[in-house]
Curated annotation (Swiss-Prot):
Keyword Glycoprotein: no
Name of protein: TP53-regulated inhibitor of apoptosis 1
Gene source species: Mus musculus
Cysteine-cysteine disulfides: 8-47, 18-37
Residue span of motif Cx9C motif 2: 37-47
Span of domain CHCH: 5-55
Ranges in a coiled coil: 1-52
Biological role: Involved in the modulation of the mitochondrial apoptotic pathway by ensuring the accumulation of cardiolipin (CL) in mitochondrial membranes. In vitro, the TRIAP1:PRELID1 complex mediates the transfer of phosphatidic acid (PA) between liposomes and probably functions as a PA transporter across the mitochondrion intermembrane space to provide PA for CL synthesis in the inner membrane.
Catalytic activity: a 1,2-diacyl-sn-glycero-3-phosphate(in) = a 1,2-diacyl-sn-glycero-3-phosphate(out)
Residue interval(s) of motif Cx9C motif 1: 8-18
Length: 76
C-alpha cells in the first residue's frame, strides 16, 4: 500500500520491512528490547504529516500524533 504522500512511499516500505523483520526475528522470540526502526518511523511520520498539511487533509488531532500525548477525552 502506498503512503498518503508520494514522497513518503519509499520511507513507508523501508519502515514496514524493518518493523516486520524486527517483529518476526526479535519480538516474537521474546526479545522486546529496543526497536531498531524508531528513526525510520520518525522520518516517515514527519513526511506523512507534511503531506497531510500540504494536501490540506482535515485530520482532527494531528497536532498530537506521535508526541506521547493522549487524545483529549472530549474527542471521538
Amino acid at each position: 500500500m502506498n503512503s498518503v504522500g508520494e514522497a513518503c512511499t519509499d520511507m513507508k516500505r523501508e519502515y514496514d520491512q524493518c518493523f516486520n523483520r524486527w517483529f518476526a526475528e526479535k519480538f516474537l522470540k521474546g526479545d522486546g528490547s529496543g526497536d531498531p526502526c524508531t528513526d525510520l518511523f520518525k522520518r516517515y511520520q514527519q513526511c506523512v504529516q507534511k503531506a497531510i498539511k500540504e494536501k490540506e487533509i482535515p485530520i482532527e488531532g494531528l497536532e498530537f500524533m506521535g508526541h506521547g500525548k493522549e487524545k483529549p477525552e472530549n474527542s471521538s
